[in-house]
Curated annotation (Swiss-Prot):
<dbReference type="GO" id="GO:0051649">
    <property type="term" value="P:establishment of localization in cell"/>
</dbReference>
<dbReference type="GO" id="GO:0019229">
    <property type="term" value="P:regulation of vasoconstriction"/>
</dbReference>
<dbReference type="GO" id="GO:0150052">
    <property type="term" value="P:regulation of postsynapse assembly"/>
</dbReference>
<feature type="modified residue" description="Phosphoserine">
    <location>
        <position position="11"/>
    </location>
</feature>
<dbReference type="GO" id="GO:0160125">
    <property type="term" value="F:pH-gated sodium channel activity"/>
</dbReference>
<dbReference type="GO" id="GO:0034765">
    <property type="term" value="P:regulation of monoatomic ion transmembrane transport"/>
</dbReference>
<dbReference type="GO" id="GO:0005886">
    <property type="term" value="C:plasma membrane"/>
</dbReference>
<dbReference type="GO" id="GO:0034220">
    <property type="term" value="P:monoatomic ion transmembrane transport"/>
</dbReference>
<dbReference type="GO" id="GO:0022839">
    <property type="term" value="F:monoatomic ion-gated channel activity"/>
</dbReference>
<feature type="disulfide bond">
    <location>
        <begin position="322"/>
        <end position="334"/>
    </location>
</feature>
<feature type="disulfide bond">
    <location>
        <begin position="92"/>
        <end position="193"/>
    </location>
</feature>
<dbReference type="GO" id="GO:0043197">
    <property type="term" value="C:dendritic spine"/>
</dbReference>
<comment type="subunit">
    <text>Can form homotrimers. Heterotrimer; forms functional heterotrimers producing channel with different properties. Forms heterotrimers with ASIC1; while ASIC1 determines current amplitude, ASIC2 influences the properties of the current. Forms heterotrimers with ASIC3; resulting in channels with distinct properties. Interacts with STOM; STOM regulates the gating of ASIC2-containing channels. Interacts with PICK1; promotes ASIC3 phosphorylation by PKC and activation of ASIC2/ASIC3 heterotrimers.</text>
</comment>
<dbReference type="GO" id="GO:0043025">
    <property type="term" value="C:neuronal cell body"/>
</dbReference>
<dbReference type="GO" id="GO:0016020">
    <property type="term" value="C:membrane"/>
</dbReference>
<dbReference type="GO" id="GO:0007602">
    <property type="term" value="P:phototransduction"/>
</dbReference>
<keyword id="KW-1003">Cell membrane</keyword>
Length: 512
């Protein structure tokens, strides 16, 4: 029976589940728990409710599963700016060592490293060299009665590397003259390089308020091919090209020009139209980025290039007990012998076989610069004579050594590329709430009603248990009292008529 008999009055009352079903906002259950016997209508309503509940659980589990797959979407936008910070520009001559600056002591210590001499300090293939160069090299490589002096790789690179003051023919930024003093010396795998707008030494970062040519950096360089080292052997540092390597990067990112730079050839004016990109990536579990504020051992700001340099430095120091000149830290610089026998092979091994040693994640915030390059030939036939007179160089020399580099913003805007969470908690709750409303007509308040019903049900059961314990204790006490009273059943000769509606408490008193 769905109706239960009241213990106090003997009347029929609805059960607690029936009361809840008829007062709850949960759809359908009032038709299941109705007063009366089981009917087909109640069964159909029960099937419909259970089916809807099953569909709700299936759809909700799918939404929860999608949330925990941590998907992301990418938002691309273009923002117009009033002004933009001009990027740092690092440039290196592809020839790291000026031949005329080499000394006998340099060749004694580093001749094999430069592939100019063999292990016996002899010129390996003299027939490949230009006679003039060969004669100069023979004079410098004459070690008869020579007493070697101390040798420092840092001093060697600083002295022998190309000097920007000699290379630069003119420099302009936004139409205003600039010079070698506006560049900072940095060391890379190419040796002595120069960075424009580095922001170091307390110098303010340069900005630009216009896009297009004439509103950026324009420099004319002489790459000095006459100073290039003769090549008759190959090492890790050997290059067969002539020109400069250039990298455009943010000031917080160290140059990694050997992998990220682009080449600029002599005999051409190269136009580089760039656009700033600001990228935002998500951390785990939505992405794989690492916070830029989490610095490294040798760099305060995290970036992929900083991570690579940091990792290579630690690897070389661990394996060779020294560091290359372009590497940060306080370990001693590698000698030429350590360079050739340990450092260079170790870097090659790191790149080829031990790539898992340097796993550098993308920073969560990154600034990079897209580039579009175009070139025109210089000098033109009409300007050749003028340039010959201006620089006191032949047309052949100008064509083989002079280049012009023009770097500018394509437009005064920047592009934002941002990863966003495809599915957040608010969307998950909204979807589940919508499914609940669709299938069972429930809401958050309905769930609160369920919890309230469960609470009242538990409270009622606990009170019933406590009431029964008190009733049993009272009954035992009454039984002991009745045993001490005299038995009057023999003296009572008439029948007591007790109405059927008399309360149980009165009957107990009469019975006692």
């Amino acid at each position: 029976m769905d109706l239960k008999e009241s213990p106090s009055e003997g009347s029929l009352q609805p059960s607690s589940i029936q009361i809840f079903a008829n007062t709850s906002t949960l759809h359908g259950i009032r038709h299941i728990f109705v007063y009366g016997p089981l009917t087909i209508r109640r069964v159909l309503w029960a099937v419909a409710f259970v089916g809807s509940l099953g569909l709700l659980l299936v759809e909700s589990s799918e939404r929860v599963s999608y949330y925990f797959s941590y998907q992301h979407v990418t938002k691309v936008d273009e923002v117009v700016a009033q002004s933009l910070v001009f990027p740092a520009v690092t440039l290196c001559n592809l020839n790291g060592f000026r031949f005329s600056r080499l000394t006998t002591n340099d060749l004694y210590h580093a001749g094999e490293l430069l592939a100019l001499l063999d292990v016996n300090l002899q010129i390996p293939d003299p027939h490949l060299a230009d006679p003039t160069v060969l004669e100069a090299l023979r004079q410098k490589a004459n070690f008869k009665h020579y007493k070697p002096k101390q040798f420092s790789m840092l001093e060697f690179l600083h002295r022998v590397g190309h000097d920007l003051k000699d290379m630069m023919l003119y420099c302009k930024f936004k139409g205003q003259e600039c010079g070698h003093q506006d560049f900072t010396t940095v060391f890379t795998k190419y040796g002595k390089c120069y960075m424009f707008n580095s922001g170091e030494d307390g110098k303010p970062l340069l900005t630009t308020v216009k896009g297009g040519t004439g509103n950026g950096l324009e420099i004319m360089l002489d790459i000095q091919q006459d100073e290039y080292l003769p090549i008759w052997g190959e090492t890790e540092e050997t290059t067969f090209e002539a020109g400069v390597k250039v990298q455009i990067h943010s000031q917080s990112e160290p140059p990694f020009i050997q992998e990220l730079g682009f080449g600029v050839a002599p005999g051409f004016q190269t136009f580089v139209a760039t656009q700033e990109q600001r990228l935002t990536y998500l951390p785990p579990p939505w992405g794989e980025c690492r916070s830029s504020e989490m610095g490294l051992d040798f760099f305060p700001v995290y970036s992929i290039t900083a991570c690579r340099i940091d990792c290579e430095t630690r690897y070389i120091v661990e394996n060779c007990n020294c560091r290359m000149v372009h590497m940060p830290g306080d370990a001693p610089f590698c000698t030429p012998e350590q360079h050739k026998e340990c450092a260079e092979p170790a870097l090659g091994l790191l790149a080829e076989k031990d790539s898992n040693y340097c796993l550098c994640r993308t920073p969560c915030n990154l600034t990079r610069y897209n580039k579009e390059l175009s070139m025109v030939k210089i000098p033109s036939k009409t300007s050749a004579k003028y340039l010959e007179k201006k620089f006191n160089k032949s047309e052949k020399y100008i064509s083989e050594n002079i280049l012009v580099l023009d770097i500018f913003f394509e437009a005064l805007n920047y592009e934002t590329i941002e990863q966003k969470k495809a599915y957040e908690v608010a969307a998950l709750l909204g979807d589940i709430g919508g499914q609940m409303g669709l299938f069972i007509g429930a809401s958050i308040l309905t769930i609160l009603e369920l919890f309230d019903y469960i609470y009242e049900l538990i409270k009622e059961k606990l009170l019933d248990l406590l009431g029964k314990e008190e009733e049993e204790g009272s009954h035992d006490e009454n039984m002991s009292t009745c045993d001490t009273m005299p038995n009057h059943s023999e003296t009572i000769s008439h029948t007591v008529n007790v109405p059927l509606q008399t309360a149980l408490g009165t009957l107990e008193e009469i019975a006692c």
